[in-house]
Amino acid sequence: MESQGQWNPLLSFSRFINHHSNHLATRLEETKRLAGTLIQSHTRTKPAFAATLTPNHVAKSLAGTSVYTVSNSDNEFVLMSDAEGAKSIGLLCFRQEDAEAFLAQVRSRKKEFRGGAKVVPITLDQVYMLKVEGIAFRFLPDPVQIKNALELRAANRGSFDGVPVFQSDLLVVKKKNKRYCPVYFSKEDLEYELSKVSRSSKGVGVSQHIMVGSFEDVLKKMELSEKSSGWEDLVFIPPGKKHSQHMQEVIA
């Protein structure tokens, strides 16, 4: 039984999310275990002694996508204890309304945050560079996209750990002798792009062209992969942004 004199904000917010999204059967504490279907089309034989992708390269692939967190009056991240209370982490929400809910939890439990705490956006490339510096974060995905991921993973619909990302080989772009593979945080955005490039992708068959994986797992694959392995081709498309517009900005 939880003590009435202590508050574990990670556990408290996890219960809040589960209360509103209990059908998704996922818990915030379980996102340490990275799972999900890998985007296997990018796995190739790795050359010996090849250089791995640099943090700047990985960060560039993440540019443009914003997440939301809570900061105090000094614009510092409001950190939470992990499930064991061993370390502090920052919570990053893919939906602003989830960050607002977290802010309400913080204000109700911590008097010092009632006046100056606020929700602030931060881009994923900035988050990644902070991670490189040793700051720990936990992502809270969009529950709609969790539902989409579970529907695509027909063989295992029990749970999905991490942030879902979606990809299709039909949308690979080749320009300036380079290959770019867009990865989406929104299944709906991917379906819209597929509807423009392939007649066969319309209607019921659209899911046949879509692969789903965990953002955290894909990110780890990028960090551990060498150049020319295929993982350096990935470009993450911000939710709601047009595929062509973002690719032009990245390629420029």
From Swiss-Prot:
InterPro entries, per the entry: Tic22, Tic22-like
GO cellular component: chloroplast intermembrane space; membrane
Lipid bilayer topology: Peripheral membrane protein
Domain of life assignment: Eukaryota
Keywords: Chloroplast, Membrane, Plastid, Protein transport, Transit peptide, Transport
Chain segment of the transit peptide: 1-50
Function: Involved in protein precursor import into chloroplasts. Imported into the intermembrane space via the Toc translocon. May be involved in the import pathway used by proteins without a cleavable N-terminal pre-sequence.
Record family assignment: Belongs to the Tic22 family.
Name recorded for this polypeptide: Protein TIC 22, chloroplastic
